[in-house]
Amino acid sequence: VSVPFPEPTEHVSTRTEVYLRYLAYFRDGVGRRVEAMTEDEARRSRVPSGWTPRELVRHLTFMERRWFVWGFEGTPVDDPHGDEVDGRWVVPDEVGTADVLAAWRRQAEVTEAVVRRHDLDEVGRPSERWDGEPPATLERVLLHVVQEYARHLGQLDVVAELGGGVTGEV
C-alpha cells in the first residue's frame, strides 16, 4: 500500500506531522521504485554521473544520519560520509540491494524517533556536522531533508523510466 500524497487541505494536528507525512510520502516513492527493480537493475547506472539506484538509497541512509543523529542531536557516528568515496556514492559489491533497503528503513525509524523527541523550534547541538556554523533548528533540518528526498525521487523517476520501471504518483 502506497503512502498517499499529503494534500494541503488535509487536517494534520501538528507541523511535525506535516513534515513527517511528506517525508514518508517521498520515502515510499523511493522504496517502491527500487523494490520493483531486479538486483541487476538496482546496480545499473543509467545516468552520466554514474550513480545507481542502490547507491542513491545508501546515500539517503547516510544523509539522514548526518542531519539528524550526527548533526541535530550531536551524537558521534562512525564514518558519517561512508556512502561516498572521492565524492561518488558507493555500495560494497557484496552488499545486496535488500540489505541496503533494510538499513535505509532502520535509519528512517531512527530519524522519526529523533524528530518526535524534539520541538521543531529546537536548535541542534554543536557538532562537526555544522562545519563551524551555528546549528539549525529541527524544522530547517526537516525541510532540507524533505527537499532532498523530493529531488532524489525525481532523479530516480527518470532512471526508473529509462529502465521501464515504476514511475510517477502510483
What are these regions (language model features)?
Residues 2-9, 16-87, 127-170:
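Short, contiguous alpha-helical
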Residues 13-19, 97-101:
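Active-site rim elements
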Residues 87-126, 139-145:
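Acidic/histidine-rich alpha-helical segments that form the ligand environment
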